[in-house]
Curated annotation (Swiss-Prot):
Homodimer. Heterotetramer of two MnmE and two MnmG subunits. GO terms for molecular function: flavin adenine dinucleotide binding. SUPFAM superfamilies: FAD/NAD(P)-binding domain. GO terms for biological process: tRNA methylation; tRNA wobble uridine modification. Belongs to the MnmG family. It comes from Shewanella piezotolerans (strain WP3 / JCM 13877). PROSITE patterns: GIDA_1, GIDA_2. Keywords: Cytoplasm, FAD, Flavoprotein, NAD, tRNA processing. NAD(+) binds at residues 273-287. This is tRNA uridine 5-carboxymethylaminomethyl modification enzyme MnmG. It is found in: Cytoplasm. The keyword Flavoprotein applies. Its cofactor is FAD.
Length: 629
C-alpha cells in the first residue's frame, strides 16, 4: 500500500537529530516527512535534563546560528543557566542549561507543528526500499510505503535495542518504547559496517524523599545567560537550584559487592560504553584510588518531583541501586521512581559516510546521531541539521556542504567520525578542535549565519537581527580605531586612574582597550569614551576581537597554510594500488577508509607527509586534482 503523496525528504526518528534534520530540510523548501513511532515523544530528552556544556554548548550555538531549534527550545525550557569556565578565556567558555523536560518537548513539538513544508506521521519504519544502490523510500510497520529520493535515518538507541537491569534484559529502544528490530535487520543487509555500543542512565529519585539540607546548593548564574542568538532572558521560566553530594566508601563497597550481578562485569553486555560518561560501576573500577565521586542532583522540571542524580548511571540490579542511593548523604531515605539501566544498540561505522553524512554505498541515504556512534543531544542535533540540509541540497541538484575543521565544531565532529571512525560513543570537547580560539561560542553566528542564509536555513527575522548586530560591531570597531587620545588631553586625567601605567604617547581607543587592565564596559563608562553599544553580545564581540586580535590573526595564518591541500578532493573510486610509491600499509588504509579529501587522508593513522606528496603527484599527473566543495 502506497501513501497518496510523494516527498522530497523522509526523516526517520523524532529525537534531537531527527527534529533538526526535518526542520532543516523543510526550511530549505523541501517537502519533508518526519516519521516517528510516537508523536507524543518528539523532542524527548531521553537521558539527562540538560543542554550544553564544554564543547557541547559550542555545537548548540552552531545549530542556532544555522537556524536550528535546540537553543530556542532551551531558552524556553531552561530552569537553570550557567557559564562554565567563566574565569578562563573565551575559547573554552561554555553555556549549560538545566531544562524542564516537559517544556522542552512542548517547545520542540510547537516548532515542528508550525514549520511549513513539514508533515508528521506516526508509524515505525521496518524497511528501506533500495533500487540500483539508491534509496527510493521506506515501508512502515503496517505496510504503508512512502516514496522519496532522500532518507535520513536518526534511529538513536532503537536499532536492536536491549535494556539491561542487573542480569535481566529485554528488548527496548529506551525505557517504555519498543526497539526497531526489523529495521536493524534490514540495515545489516547493506554494505555498511555495523557494531554495538552501550549507554546508560541513573535511577530517578523522588525529591520528596531527599534531604537537600545535607547537600551543597548550586545556584545558576546572575545575570542569566541565553542560549540562542535571538533569545531573550525574559523567555526563561522560573529558575531553580541544583545540589551537589558525593558517594563514599560505603557506596563503593555496595557497588563492588554487586558487581557479580552487573551485566557489564559478567559479560552479558558486549557493547562499549561512553568513556566520558561512565557508569558508577566503571568509575569505582577505573578510579579505585578515589574514595568519593561527585553527584549533581538535578531537577527534571518545575512540575515534577523527579530528580536526576547525575553521576550514578548504573545497570546494577534494583536492590543494589536502592542500597547505593541510600548510602549517599542526603538520600538516606530516598525512593527510586524509575530504575537506572544500560542499553545496547547497533551503530554503523561512520567511516562509511561522506562528510555530507550520506552513505558512500547507497545514494540518498543519510545517517545522523547515535547511529553514527556519537553520544549526546548536541552532537545528534548538529548531525541532524547537517544531514537534513544536505538531503535537501542533493534533491535540489546542488552541491552538498560541510564546514571545515577551522569553521565549526560541527566540522570537527564530522571529520573525526568520517575519517577516523569510533569504537566508543563519541562526544565533543573543545580539546578536539585545533583552532578553538576561532571556534568560540560567542562567534558561532559570525562564522555560520551568513552561510546558513545562503543555503536557505536562516529566516528573515534571524537574518535581520544578525545584520543589525554585525553593523553595530563594525561601526563600533571603526570608531575605536579612528578616535585618538593625546597625552595632554583632558581625558587623560580621567583615564589614568584606571591604568597601571599612565598614557605617555598618542593612542587610539582600540589601543586602550587592548590593555589587560581595561575592559569595554569600564572604558565606555569613562566620560569622553562612551557611550558605546547597548547590545551586550555585540559589545562582548567588540572586546574579544580587539583584545585577542593578535592571537586570532596568528591562528588564521596557520589555517591559511594548512588549508592549501585540505580541500583537495580524492575520487571515491580511486584504486590506491595503482598509485606508485605508496606502502602496502597506506594502500590498505586508503582503500579501507576511502577519504574524500587530502585533508581527511592526512589524518588517517599511519599516513605520512611523504605518502601525501606521492598522492598529490599522482593526482596531478592523472589530471585528477580538484577542490572539494
Amino acid at each position: 500500500m502506497h501513501f497518496h503523496e510523494r516527498f522530497d525528504v523522509i526523516v526517520v526518528g523524532g529525537g534531537h537529530a531527527g527534529t533538526e534534520a526535518a526542520l532543516a530540510s523543510a526550511r530549505m523548501g523541501s517537502k519533508t516527512l518526519l516519521l516517528t513511532h510516537n508523536i507524543d515523544t518528539l523532542g524527548q530528552m531521553s537521558c539527562n535534563p540538560a543542554i550544553g556544556g564544554i564543547g557541547k554548548g559550542h555545537l548548540v550555538k552552531e545549530i542556532d546560528a544555522l537556524g536550528g531549534a535546540m537553543a530556542i527550545a532551551t531558552d524556553y525550557a531552561g530552569i537553570q543557566f550557567r557559564t562554565l569556565n567563566s574565569s578562563k578565556g573565551p575559547a573554552v567558555r561554555a553555556t549549560r542549561a538545566q531544562a524542564d523536560r516537559a517544556l522542552y518537548r512542548h517547545k520542540i513539538q510547537e516548532i515542528l507543528q508550525h514549520q511549513p513544508n513539514l508533515r508528521i506521521f506516526q508509524q515505525a519504519v521496518d524497511d528501506l526500499v533500495v533500487e540500483n544502490e539508491t534509496v527510493v523510500g521506506v515501508v512502515t510497520q503496517m505496510g504503508l510505503a512512502f516514496e522519496a529520493p532522500a532518507v535520513v535515518l536518526t534511529t538513536g538507541t532503537f536499532l536492536s535495542g536491549k535494556i539491561h537491569i542487573g542480569l535481566e534484559n529485554y528488548s527496548g529502544g529506551r525505557a517504555g518504547d519498543p526497539p526497531a528490530i526489523a529495521l536493524a535487520h534490514r540495515l545489516q543487509e547493506l554494505p555498511i559496517r555495523v557494531g554495538r555500543l552501550k549507554t546508560g542512565t541513573p535511577p530517578r529519585i523522588d525529591a520528596n524523599t531527599i534531604d537537600f539540607s545535607k547537600m551543597t546548593e548550586q545556584k545558576g548564574d546572575d545575570p542569566l545567560p541565553v542560549m540562542s542568538f535571538i533569545g531573550d532572558v525574559n523567555q526563561h521560566p522560573e529558575q531553580v537550584s541544583c545540589h551537589i553530594t558525593h558517594t563514599n566508601e560505603r557506596t563503593h563497597d555496595i557497588i563492588r559487592a554487586g558487581l557479580d550481578r552487573s551485566p557489564m562485569y559478567s559479560g552479558v553486555i558486549e557493547g562499549i560504553g561512553p568513556r566520558y560518561c561512565p557508569s558508577i560501576e566503571d568509575k569505582i573500577n577505573r578510579f579505585a584510588d578515589k574514595n568519593s565521586h561527585q553527584i549533581f542532583i538535578e531537577p527534571e522540571g518545575l512540575n515534577t518531583t523527579e530528580i536526576y542524580p547525575n553521576g550514578i548511571s548504573t545497570s546494577l540490579p534494583f536492590d543494589v541501586q536502592l542500597n547505593l542511593v541510600r548510602s549517599i548523604k542526603g538520600m538516606e531515605n530516598a525512593e527510586i521512581m524509575r530504575p537506572g539501566y544500560a542499553i545496547e544498540y547497533d551503530y554503523f561505522d561512520p567511516r562509511d559516510l561522506k562528510n555530507s553524512l550520506e552513505t558512500k554505498t547507497i545514494n540518498g541515504l543519510f545517517f545522523a546521531g547515535q547511529i553514527n556512534g556519537t553520544t549526546g543531544y548536541e552532537e545528534a542535533g548538529a548531525q541532524g541539521l547537517l544531514a537534513g540540509m544536505n538531503a535537501s541540497l542533493q534533491i535540489q541538484g546542488k552541491e552538498t556542504w560541510c564546514p571545515r575543521r577551522d569553521q565549526a565544531y560541527l566540522g570537527v565532529l564530522v571529520d573525526d567520525l568520517s575519517t577516523l571512525g569510533t569504537k566508543e560513543p563519541y562526544r565533543m570537547f573543545t580539546s578536539r578542535a585545533e583552532y578553538r580560539l576561532l571556534l568560540r561560542e560567542d562567534n558561532a553566528d559570525l562564522r555560520l549565519t551568513e552561510k546558513g542564509r545562503e543555503l536557505g536555513l536562516v529566516d528573515d527575522e534571524r537574518w535581520a537581527k544578525f545584520s543589525d548586530k554585525m553593523e553595530s560591531i563594525e561601526t563600533e570597531l571603526q570608531r575605536l580605531r579612528s578616535q585618538w587620545i593625546h597625552p595632554r588631553s583632558p581625558l587623560v586625567d580621567v583615564l589614568n586612574p584606571h591604568l597601571k601605567t599612565p598614557i605617555a604617547r598618542e593612542a587610539t581607543f582600540e589601543d586602550l582597550l587592548r590593555r589587560p587592565e581595561l575592559d569595554y564596559p569600564t572604558l565606555m563608562s569613562i566620560d569622553g569614551f562612551g557611550p558605546g553599544i547597548d547590545d551586550q553580545r555585540a559589545a562582548e564581540q567588540v572586546q574579544i576581537q580587539v583584545k585577542y586580535s593578535g592571537y586570532i590573526q596568528r591562528q588564521q595564518d596557520e589555517i591559511d597554510k594548512a588549508i592549501r591541500h585540505e580541500t583537495t578532493g580524492l575520487p571515491l573510486d580511486l584504486d590506491y594500488q595503482e598509485v606508485p610509491g605508496l606502502s602496502n600499509e597506506v594502500i590498505a588504509k586508503m582503500n579501507e577508509h576511502k577519504p574524500e579529501t587530502v585533508g581527511q587522508a592526512s589524518r588517517i593513522s599511519g599516513m605520512t607527509p611523504a605518502a601525501i606528496s606521492i598522492l598529490l603527484v599522482h593526482l596531478k599527473k592523472r589530471g585528477l586534482l580538484r577542490k572539494s566543495a
